[in-house]
Amino acid sequence: MTQTIQVAVPGPFAEPLDYLAPTNEPLPQPGMRVQVPLGRRQLVGMVVETQAQTHIESHRLKSIITTLDSEPLIDADLLALIIWSAHYYHHPIGEALISALPARLRQGHAATPSAETLWQLSAHAQASDLDALRRRAPRQAMLLEHLMQSQTLTAAQLAGLGGDARAALQKLVAKGFATTQQQHHYGLMAGHASEPAFALNDAQHTSAAAIQPGHGHAILLIDGVTGSGKTEVYLDAITRAIQQGLQTLVIVPEIGLTPQLLSRFQRRLAAQIAVLHSGLSDSERLNAWLAARAGKADVLIGTRSAIFVPLARPGLIIVDEEHDASLKQQDGFRYSARDLAILRAHRLEVPIALGSATPSLETLANARSQRYQHHQLSERAGQAQAPLMRLLDMRGQPTHEGLSAPLIERVQSHLDADGQVLLFLNRRGFSPTLICHECGWLAECQRCDARMTYHRGKRRLHCHHCDREQPIPRDCPSCGSVDLRPLGLGTERIEQALQSRFADTPLVRIDRDSTRQRGSFERQMQAAQRGEAKLLLGTQMLAKGHHLPTVTLVGVIDADQGLFGADFRAPERLAQLIIQVAGRAGRAERPGEVAIQTHHPEHPLLQMLIHGG
């Protein structure tokens, strides 16, 4: 009797579809990919169950075309977690399972990492060959000598030896002095542990000691003020996990936090580290995914989708900035990476640490009801002190493109004292939208009805909701007037005002638009961390987790935008953003100051932030 197999395929299907087992092939197992027919198409799906019961007559079922994997890509626990997630978040099961895979696996490519050419010294090579080559082919002699010393050469090492090194090596291969072979290349970053561990203070030591990899499941909230050394707590726990041969999964909310965390982990850990986020190529993401699955990576740092990466020897999960809304997938298969991380840690029976300076209200409620262990780091590490916070009353104040005279005065004062200034506005673009001064027409997206953001540099209107773009109209579509004006403030508009007011001061703007090119964010952050840019302007990309030791003033340009939003979480998120961005000030020896512009200085939320933190 032919076996019936349930396969989850991408599409609007609440449950897996029934297929007959492939002929002349071993029976595919749950977690394997298969190629199946669906209508006139052929799709990549994933086997969910092999002992399936079906009410459909077998002659009406189609057969699986072929099995794409020799072993399950996803283990039973992770498969069950993704299926549970699809049901919980009311999403088609096939879409959820397939979206959990790297793009190349979704497309049906082999589950193998990239190949790297390795050059090795041939057994026939002799020292006398080297002497002969020095006279006739000095370049080949240099490479042969290198091989005699190190035995092997990788492509990365070869790239540092000059443009003609590969051609010279090929000649050595032709002469029988060297051989080549292909090896798997996972793209791992090696930690060199060049920096000694910091001595933990009492609060850090208590928090770190509570995280026990290899000793069962526990949920711990590491509730530490900005600059309190939460990362040191993570590093202590990760080091102990590595010593036990266990892997650690670290989830971060933003791509921008990955380079800084990776650099710090490399300096402190003697480990193989993989990174997974959307800024990598498809091949790089597949390599990282496979490295974690094969146990080649000791630590995996990733954004929210990394929660679905299989782990060969799981020991610890860390969710940094657990409160952050970026941990929630907002389109396609919608899910909360933090909540799924907690569930996955429970299924794997490993501890999970949730870190934040501004925990979400639901996490605080769980901690106070003792569902989570609550560990507080209430003081900044080292000699750093909490910044002085003040409100700048905007009522009746003349402004220059949203910048009040008191804020401009504080910026100038800190620049004169050789300080670094960070100005925060959580709205990219030149202005939120365009308005007609004659009739009040507003630029709305014709696809989704959201307001279209005005980008002056590109001379375009861009919908940040559905990604639609269009040219700026020459006249009002409603009344024909040519008096179209930008309405409200965006980072591009503030940048223009700052360049006019502080023309001789190096300025860096960091938002999603200015960091689209690969590596641009890292370059801009390095300039900021070295103090080369004295004025920093940015959105929430700058507010989270970055160590900027020379920032002495943080200015919040528009606190009011979060006070009266329709979202019931708007006040909570405003408080979190202000506290997070305020934490960038005064992180080293010099004291910090935070200036918050508002038309509502008496608002209870702002008063609580200023006086109660």
What are these regions (language model features)?
Residues 1-356, 363, 368-384:
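Accessory, non-ATPase domains that flank or precede helicase/AAA+ motor cores in DNA-metabolism machines
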